[in-house]
From Swiss-Prot:
The keyword Metal-binding applies. It comes from Streptococcus pyogenes serotype M1. This is Protease HtpX homolog. Its cofactor is Zn(2+). The gene is htpX. Pfam families: Peptidase_M48 (PF01435). The lineage of its organism: Bacteria, Bacillati, Bacillota, Bacilli, Lactobacillales. It is found in: Cell membrane.
Length: 298
């Protein structure tokens, strides 16, 4: 059951990424049709923008991400218990030892970052280290080490970049149309061709809806990688109860004291900001109750 869950989560992520690239291609083709009368050029430009943006975000400095989240790097001497758990989990996962950081915050949380296992880092709040016992900490750190081993940070970064690219292209396309960028097409093609009218309307509709759809896909990918990291943590620790108990404590945690931006929020094991009341479709994390239920059903 454990390996089936891991396999299913990986497959769902692949499907979502394929849909994401298809959406980016669609929005590019739509903008190209409306503004340049050229589907292909718009499609190529959209994909190029997406790839460049994703590449630049992937190689964002690990130290910069840690600094943005008020994390301080610690040595084995400063935090031996935490350091040794990270070391043990990295050894089991067969990845290089990540850098270790602590965030001075009473909330219970942790996250990992880095584009690859070779330049990764793990951070935990002081609240988490004070409240959780070793069994629970192993579950949490196993979760974060799994994110590193599974290249989740890279996948999530690509998803954020693609969502941003879709939004930027839609915004530029909409502004150019608003200020008369599409007027030439309307004058030149002033016939009653039903197909052209339908194509025009569909292109306009895609420009309007694409940012929302892109955001939903990006959030769905983030939730799937959380499920995968939970299951992968159990694979590393061979102790589902440790992960379950950790999640039960995380469920009671207060929001973090310092502000957390959207990109960083998706990295944490638990939503670091105030819980929102709207649909889970708009959440970076699946409900903890569902995560616990999945682990119990393994």
């Amino acid at each position: 059951m454990l390996y089936q869950q891991i396999s299913q989560n990986k497959q769902r992520t692949v499907v979502l990424l394929v849909v994401f690239f298809a959406l980016l291609a669609l929005i590019g083709a739509s903008a190209g049709y409306l503004l340049l009368d050229n589907y292909a050029m718009g499609l190529v430009l959209a994909l190029v923008i997406g790839v460049i943006y994703a590449t630049s975000m992937i190689f964002q400095s690990t130290s910069l991400v840690m600094s943005m989240n008020n994390a301080r790097e610690v040595t084995e001497k400063e935090a031996p218990g935490f350091f040794h758990i990270v070391e043990d989990m990295a050894m089991v996962a067969q990845i290089p030892m990540p850098r270790v950081f602590i965030i001075e915050d009473p909330s219970l949380n942790a996250f990992a970052t880095g584009s690859s296992p070779q330049n990764a880092a793990v951070a935990a709040t002081t609240g988490l280290l004070e409240v959780m016992n070793r069994e629970e900490l192993e579950g949490v750190i196993g979760h974060e080490i799994s994110h590193i081993r599974n290249y989740d940070i890279r996948i999530s970064t690509i998803a954020v970049a693609l969502a941003s690219a879709v939004t930027v292209i839609s915004s530029i396309g909409g502004r150019m149309l608003w200020y008369g960028g599409g007027s030439r097409r309307q004058r030149d093609d002033g016939d009653d061709d039903v197909l052209r009218i339908i194509t025009l309307l569909l292109s306009l509709l895609s420009l309007l809806l694409a940012p929302l759809v892109a955001s939903l896909i990006q959030l769905a990918i983030s939730r799937q990688r959380e499920y995968l990291a939970d299951a992968s943590s159990v694979e590393l620790t061979r102790n589902p109860q440790g992960m379950i108990k950790a999640l039960e404590k995380l469920q009671l945690s207060q929001p973090m004291k310092h502000p957390v931006d959207d990109a960083s929020a998706a990295l944490y094991i638990n939503e670091p900001r105030k819980k929102r009341s709207f649909s889970s479709l708009f959440s970076t994390h699946p409900p903890i109750e569902e995560r616990i239920e999945r682990l119990k059903n393994m």
